[in-house]
């Protein structure tokens, strides 16, 4: 029997309240559970001590028996110092996808072309100006 330490939703519509329970993975989210080990009230401020209550001893017991916490419960237990959750890092997820990379490359190329054109335009009048001054000097002499 695979066990999970998870949240079971209670409370009224738009007023969530969760119980931290030990349940078989096959049972429904709000259905049958083995033991209630705490509560979670997301409506309270994060610094409120009543926001999350967990019986640490029972959580340790169930973890030693082999129950696995869900992601949210793992955060709670990690904050309590009972469970260490794995650091999650997926650098591939934040990379732009193929179409976005094509757009970025096109924008980069357009920017380089604009910079090259501006540089060429800046150099062209500079070359013509000294050439225009040379005939004027010859006319004065």
From Swiss-Prot:
Segments of this protein annotated with the region Disordered: 84-141
Lineage: Bacteria, Pseudomonadati, Pseudomonadota, Alphaproteobacteria, Hyphomicrobiales
Native species: Parvibaculum lavamentivorans (strain DS-1 / DSM 13023 / NCIMB 13966)
UniProt-listed InterPro entries: Ribosomal_bS16 (IPR000307), Ribosomal_bS16_CS (IPR020592), Ribosomal_bS16_dom_sf (IPR023803)
Keyword Ribonucleoprotein among UniProt keywords: yes
Regions of compositional bias (Low complexity) in chain numbering: 115-141
Swiss-Prot/TrEMBL keywords: Ribonucleoprotein, Ribosomal protein
Top-level taxon: Bacteria
Gene Ontology CC annotation, any one: cytoplasm
Keyword Nucleotidyltransferase: no
Biased composition (Basic and acidic residues): 89-111
GO biological process: translation
PANTHER family named in the record: 30S RIBOSOMAL PROTEIN S16, SMALL RIBOSOMAL SUBUNIT PROTEIN BS16M
Molecular function terms, GO-annotated: structural constituent of ribosome
Alphabetical list of PROSITE patterns matching this protein: RIBOSOMAL_S16
Family: Belongs to the bacterial ribosomal protein bS16 family.
Gene responsible for this protein: rpsP
Name by which UniProt lists this protein: Small ribosomal subunit protein bS16
């Amino acid at each position: 029997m695979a066990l999970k330490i998870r949240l079971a939703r209670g409370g009224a519509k738009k007023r969530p309240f969760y119980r931290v329970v030990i349940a078989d993975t096959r049972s429904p989210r709000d259905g049958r559970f083995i033991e209630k080990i705490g509560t979670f009230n997301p409506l309270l401020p994060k610094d409120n001590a009543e926001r999350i209550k967990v019986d640490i001893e029972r959580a340790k017991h169930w973890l030693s028996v082999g129950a696995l916490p869900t992601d949210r419960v793992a955060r709670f237990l990690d904050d309590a110092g009972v469970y260490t959750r794995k650091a999650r890092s997926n650098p591939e997820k934040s990379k732009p996808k193929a179409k976005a990379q094509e757009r970025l490359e096109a924008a980069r190329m357009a920017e380089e072309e604009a910079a090259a054109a501006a540089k060429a335009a800046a150099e062209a009048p500079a070359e013509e100006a000294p050439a225009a001054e040379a005939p004027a000097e010859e006319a004065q002499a």
